[in-house]
Amino acid sequence: MVHPPVGIRSLAVSFPRVIRRNDYYIEKYPELVTQAEQKSLAKMFSLVGDIPSNEFELEMMPYLSDPFRGTVERRVLSPGESSLTLEYRAAKDALDAAKLSTDDVDILLVASFLPEQIGFGNAAFLARELGLQCGAWNLDATCASTPVSLQTACALVQAGGYRNALVVISCTYSRFFDEDDTLSWFFSDGAGAFVVSSLKPNQGILGTKTINTSILCDQFFFKLMEDEQGKQRLRMHVTKGINKAISETAASLLHTCCEGAISAAGITLEEIDFFIFNTASAWFASFCTRVLGIDPERTINVYPLYANIGPALTVGNLYHAAQLGKIHENDLVLIYAFGAASSASASVIRWGDVVLGPVPVNETDSTVKNSETGSIIPC
């Protein structure tokens, strides 16, 4: 069956105003930094044995002497900011870039990790802020939410029931960690949005492969706790065996999804012009290029700018790759992401004439790190 060409028409990102660098923690929590090897972040990312036992641990090795595990900057919500404010800004910028009004949006898909309130997703709340009249659906695939949402939106538009789908992704990890928890050094906040519409012939989504990640179901969990003011707050926790679980499954998930998407698209790995990975650690892009045997120049790593922003990482990497001119119209792009207790997913798309939203606040003089050489590429 031949599907009409459907894919990303515009793309935008949004980040909090506060940029928190390593010096902040060194000055405020010197004892924590000194004792980092006994704290939660170090326990999350350390060798299972005495020597690397797989590609993931091999790429992690150079970062083990760094108490921040390669993290450089984080974006953190400031007073008055929330997942909804980030989502609203990204959504508006994506619509403006596509030259669409709210009346042109036929469906809103929102993946918030996590929503602002317990029990309800952000979709209807964001629709209210945007003034949308269309349906508003919540979608959750944890850190794989971007490719899963892209697949869903493309399928809806290809089926003919919708013309323009607005997809919004956010992650606000800072709400779920105390600042003096070393795990908070690794996580960050951000959002992205894109419009999915009809494109030129042969452009858009060409093939996908998604599998579940039930093997990682028990590695992350949330607890409802009371803070010092007696307010109930969700706090995120990780198990002691998380590093072993991720390092032993990451390569298999990557191979299965990427090879499946490439096969579904009817192409070969060598034909892919550029790769987008959810770079949830400083070394994940290098890990992926090693496992797939591809040139590191064919991908990008925004981790030095944003740390781990969960599902929003994929949108951030896409945005900066396009902004830097690494992706051009009609290039073949492979997008891969995986999330614990959800899915691993890959999509092959032929890039269209994608219009970008404005460069985010505080981003004008920022930099993106080349995953192979460690050099800095100006944005």
Locate the predicted segments by residue.
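Short beta-strand segments
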Residues: 9-12, 140, 165-171, 196, ...
